[in-house]
């Protein structure tokens, strides 16, 4: 593709990038970077080689939200069907992500989720592995704020920045420092979701994930899943890895398969135990 990087084609034939070849190259390099991090424990030498190839390629990886891989759908967004139509619309967002974002007072909540309809409102997901409560209660928890015509996100530039941040943390040549790339990832995510306040959020060195108080009084969890804060700390590489993966997890919502893959690889984010049902 690189040899034909200017040979754009009909936008009618491309519902993701509108026929722009360079966007496809950036997407391919970003996927290559993702795969390099995935094998970084099994083959660190090859992982570094492939990651640096992707980032330092003449076209490079996704770096702005204009590069995001998003599918313009000819019909209904499948997440809208899953969350609002399938099985009586009893799917809801996870209590894990709402507990992290509530603790961080994350401005993206209103863009990502619907408010719960419990008496106190707020953003409350539902814990994994519960016995599903009756419909009235189940429907009161927060849902994914998705419309029938919402574009389907495949990969975003925020993830690319967080992947580069992890590579830089390992000492790889990622074109910037781990801190710079971590903060860039957060800013890109805020921009993607159309919210303000990224600078104040990045500087927050005290907020931590909350315990989970189930507004229905059924499955609360008082323990702290993690004490990870948001602000970068050059003195603690291990905590910075947790920061990177945690913020990537938030930025990648609702891409559950990628979240699960990274959880298996890194053990982050730290999650509540599954409720045995």
Mark where each language-model region is:
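C-terminal functional modules
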Residues: 190-277
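Structured, solvent-exposed acidic/aromatic patches
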Residues: 1-197, 234-239, 247
């Amino acid at each position: 593709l690189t040899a034909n990087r200017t040979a754009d084609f009909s936008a009618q034939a491309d519902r993701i990038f509108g026929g722009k070849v360079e966007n496809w190259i950036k997407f391919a390099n970003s996927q290559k970077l993702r795969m390099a991090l995935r094998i970084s424990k099994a083959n660190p030498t090859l992982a570094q080689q492939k990651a640096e190839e992707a980032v330092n390629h003449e076209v490079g990886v996704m770096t702005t939200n204009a590069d995001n891989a998003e599918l313009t759908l000819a019909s209904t967004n499948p997440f809208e069907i899953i969350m609002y139509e399938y099985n009586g619309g009893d799917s809801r967002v996870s209590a894990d992500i709402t507990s992290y974002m509530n603790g961080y007072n994350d401005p993206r909540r209103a863009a990502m989720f619907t408010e719960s309809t419990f008496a106190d409102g707020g953003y409350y997901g539902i814990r994994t592995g519960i016995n599903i409560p009756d419909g009235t209660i189940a429907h009161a928890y927060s849902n994914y704020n998705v419309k029938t015509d919402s574009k389907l996100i495949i990969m975003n530039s925020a993830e690319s920045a967080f992947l580069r941040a992890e590579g830089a943390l390992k000492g790889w040549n990622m074109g910037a420092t781990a801190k710079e790339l971590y903060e860039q990832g957060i800013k890109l995510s805020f921009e993607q979701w159309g919210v303000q306040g990224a600078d104040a959020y990045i500087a927050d060195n005290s907020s931590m994930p909350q315990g989970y108080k189930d507004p229905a009084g059924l499955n609360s969890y008082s323990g702290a899943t993690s004490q990870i804060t948001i602000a970068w700390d050059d003195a603690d590489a291990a905590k910075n890895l947790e920061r990177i993966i945690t913020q990537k997890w938030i930025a990648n919502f609702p891409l559950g398969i990628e979240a699960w893959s990274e959880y298996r690889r890194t053990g982050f984010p730290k999650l509540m135990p599954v409720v045995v049902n």
